[in-house]
Amino acid sequence: MRIAIASGKGGTGKTTLATNLAWTVASNGRTAAYLDCDVEEPNGHLFLKPRIERDEPIHRLIPVVDPALCTHCGLCSKTCRYGAIACVGRQTLVFTELCHACGGCMLVCPVDAIREEPKPIGRLRIGASGPVRFIDGTLDVGEAMSPPAIR
């Protein structure tokens, strides 16, 4: 069974309910995991006080244009629905804050001038609090895209 506690409103008690539910389920001999997907301000750790076993970076793939190969044809710019890549004169600019990491620009480039490189955007912590498995993620300050960290 999977139970998700979600709401768009802050301060409604989601974390209190979710941490207590996970603890109660695990205390009754069932397998329970607490996943704090509020990557902008996770605070389940304040209630569960987990022992962190792993702490690793979260990455998002961003396009990097090789200026030596780029012909400035503009296909990448026309393909990007988010305006994250633009051809201006003899330059191809990448706006990483707008990029959704779909890889479309890389796929349409006729000269393979675009590759993807990982960019760190936050941290993933994995551990346990007694019988409860614990996972949370934290987005770096200034990062605008939370879905890659939640995945």
Where are these regions (language model features)?
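Walker A (P-loop) phosphate-binding motif
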Residues: M1-N28, A32
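Conserved active-site and cofactor/substrate-binding residues in soluble primary-metabolism enzymes
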Residues: T16, V39, T71, L75, ...
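Short beta-strand-centered segment that lines the nucleotide-binding/catalytic pocket of NTP-utilizing
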Residues: R30-H45, P118-R123
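P-loop NTPase switch/communication element
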Residues: E40-L61, I126-V132
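Cysteine-centered iron-sulfur cluster-binding motifs in ferredoxin-type domains/subunits
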Residues: V64-G83, L93-A113
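Phosphate-binding/switch loop-helix module in NTP-utilizing enzymes
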Residues: A84-R90, F95-C102, L139-R151
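Short beta-strand "wing" residues that participate in macromolecule-binding interfaces
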Residues: C87, E116-E117
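Extended interfacial segments that mediate partner engagement and assembly in macromolecular machines
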Residues: K119, L124-R151
